[in-house]
Amino acid sequence: MEFWVVSIFDTIKEISMHPITLIYLVALLARAFTLTTASIQFSRRAMSAMKKPRLFAKTALDVLSEHTVIVADTGDVGAIAAQKPQDATTNPSLIFKAAQLPQYSQLVDDALSSSEGDIGLAMDKLAVKFGIEISKIVPGNVSTEVDARLSFSTEKTVAKARDLIAMYAEEGVGKDRILIKIAATWEGIKAAEILEKEGIRCNLTLIFGLCQAVACASIGKVTLISPFVGRIMDFYKAKQGVDKFAPAEDPGVISVTNIYNYYKKFGHKTIVMGASFRNSGEIMELCGCDRLTISPGLLDELRSMDGAGYEKKLGLGAPIYDGGDEIAMDEETFRWMLNEDEMATEKLAAGIRGFAADIVKLEKILTEKKAKP
């Protein structure tokens, strides 16, 4: 820098200010500025590199992905695209939230315009339209849920599932890409039994008790179940008056682990997909589960965590199930076991009510939007 400044002043003294001299002077100044700027930029990059934290050899998400299929739990198409999961799941609550985002207003408009004023039909079309957009991003399955208000009608659940599959087919998405989500009531499990025989694969959700999981595998012979973790933890935190559980002692983690080991011990082919997580500790404690459906926020958290110290937890050697013999399940046994499980009874009912409430809210939004000129 000093060399170029001296050169400039020497030149000014020795030569007159003719046009050609000005050009020469400008060139010298430009070169000095360029070199100085480049030096500053290099220094900034060097400092930035020094401050940048060392990258992990593996993140927690890397470790998890080696042993478990990752599924995105959201209705936000953009969030799914950012996460690049294998599969994606939706439910009425997630669709309700996504439908209020401005970037999906066109999907809402299309669902309304193609339903000829039928709000119920528009609801189904909207769920399918979200599913179609998601299917363009994920290479695997998309789960679309049946109206929770049909949870106690086998016949109506079957009819609705067939309608949803037909809507997907009209848009060129085959049933091999879709899982129909159904609440794991007795009626829902019997509906899944019928649908599975027709080649319509089912994801039985809101599973909180072993009796639900056993019935899904032995009677419904369903493709996949979604046993919940976080909501079970919520119940026992409130009941026991504690703030938190260590991951290995989390009642939700223990429940899913028990279901997983029961299936593996007795040879059931139904896929276990843990759901409803409250923290990353719950997730990593279930590393090795067939699948885990995880919210975008927790996926980001796992991606930022050092994977050192985490390892596969489920599926190590012979399954450890100490609950006795295989359960001979029928309707009477199912209803009695569910009745005796306070947590499962309460959470199943609350889950159905919650999904139904969000369906009503979404119907209201569509009705109001339809009324606008």
Q: Residue spans of the language-model regions?
A:
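Catalytic alpha/beta core domains of metabolic enzymes, predominantly
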Residues: 208-315
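Conserved, mostly hydrophobic/aromatic
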Residues: 91, 144, 180, 216, ...
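N- or domain-start disorder-to-order transition segments that initiate the globular core
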Residues: 51-75
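Active-site-adjacent beta->alpha loops and helix N-cap segments on the catalytic face
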Residues: 153-157, 182-196, 211-215
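Hydrophobic faces of well-ordered beta-strands that scaffold small-molecule active sites
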Residues: 68-73, 86-90, 140-146, 178-182, ...
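C-terminal extensions of enzymes
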Residues: 313-373
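N-terminal chloroplast transit peptides
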Residues: 19-42, 49
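Active-site beta->alpha loop and helix N-cap motifs at the rims of alpha/beta catalytic domains
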Residues: 94-97, 101-186
